[in-house]
C-alpha cells in the first residue's frame, strides 16, 4: 500500500492508514488499512487492507447486526455528516 495519510488511534501500536492499494497499478483507487505492530514492533502482515468502496457494505452489515457500540455510531454519524456537507458544498 502506498500510504498517503495516517491517523493515530488511542491504542498503542495501532494506526489507520489511507492510500493507494497494492492491487491498483494506476494509483487511481483508495484503500484503508488498520495497521498494527507485531510483537517486535514491525508491521503485522495480518493488518487488513480494504477497498474504500467496500466500507459502506461492511458497515451496513455490522450495523444491521447491532454490533457497533452507540458511541462509535455517534462518532461515525458526526464524521459522515461533515463529509456530506463538504461534498454538497463543492
What are these regions (language model features)?
Residues 14-49:
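A short, structured beta-strand/loop element
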